[in-house]
């Protein structure tokens, strides 16, 4: 082992200021004359510092050049000088390759990379786990390390490549639902008549029972509301919302009443969107369910048939007619009777759906659709009520014709009596 003091060292190449030994040799000799000697071990025992890739230890060439005046001494810090030289060479080679490559390719532009930035000290990462666009980046002059340095950004690039896009933007990958929800299915399967779904339950099934609004307390009756009726109330022309439908079904008002009603309707395959506006004007008939409306029409027909004063009205109007107009009036009554009979026959052929029944139409589609529209607004009350009213009118026509026939016969007999009296 050789022991030397730095006070006696002198670099032969004149670069004493660039090495630690040269700097020490320029200091005051008196102040450092008694400095302890430095011991140097052979170069094979020296452990250089570890540098991660792309600077493998095996590729570093440590300079073993000796000074001319001291051939037996190694370089004091050979690893630092060789590392500096390797960095300079790598930077110049990367710069030359970047300039020769010219502009970036289209995938680089899609990722908004800056061609003026060089990253010689960052390794290429994960070029094998991405799509074609990412592989093209790995082959480019900047490599995959030019995109971002964080693992989160690399994961974002993997998701973008899986989606087939290279735009590093705010667009996120949204998984497609495996199946559509109830509202989407209802939107796809809406029909013209209502909000019925393809998976709606049996229309004849009873949804709930509703107490009547028009009955007295002593004879309160309940009417069954079917699924088909609820479907018709949600469909055009009424398009009831949750508030009106809850009132029709006599449901108590609560904080979450609308949501509970929508959830129950979804169970039977019906959709009632929140914030929906009604389509038709609200009338007194809107509050009636179909069972009570039909009951009202039946009672109205019974009263018209039994209690309508057809004879009294016919006698009153016949007395208002001049005797010379009686034949003309009789012809008018007969024609009106035929017209009324035609209309009643047409109304009797109405096959609008009502309650749990859905009869087969026997009229033309245009006429039947119009009658169905009227029936949906009156909930089964309109057509039977019209037929009952027309039946009462027909009773009046029959009584008027009887009076005219009786009057003519009475006048003819009176004329014969006068002729006999003159003779």
Curated annotation (Swiss-Prot):
GO-annotated biological processes: developmental pigmentation; melanocyte differentiation; positive regulation of transcription by RNA polymerase II; regulation of cell population proliferation
Residues covered by region (H-S-H (helix-span-helix), dimerization): 276-405
Location of the region described as Disordered in the Swiss-Prot/TrEMBL record: 1-108
Compartments where found: Nucleus
Compositional bias ranges of the Polar residues kind: 79-93
Domain of life: Eukaryota
InterPro entries the record matches: TF_AP2, TF_AP2_C
GO MF assignments: DNA-binding transcription activator activity, RNA polymerase II-specific; RNA polymerase II transcription regulatory region sequence-specific DNA binding
Keywords: Activator, DNA-binding, Nucleus, Transcription, Transcription regulation
Motif stretch (PPxY motif): 50-55
Pfam family of the protein (one): TF_AP-2
GO cellular component, one term: nucleus
Compositionally skewed regions (Low complexity) per UniProt: 14-27, 57-70
Assembly information from the UniProt record: Binds DNA as a dimer. Can form homodimers or heterodimers with other AP-2 family members.
Role, per record: Sequence-specific DNA-binding protein that interacts with inducible viral and cellular enhancer elements to regulate transcription of selected genes. AP-2 factors bind to the consensus sequence 5'-GCCNNNGGC-3' and activate genes involved in a large spectrum of important biological functions.
Protein name: Transcription factor AP-2-epsilon
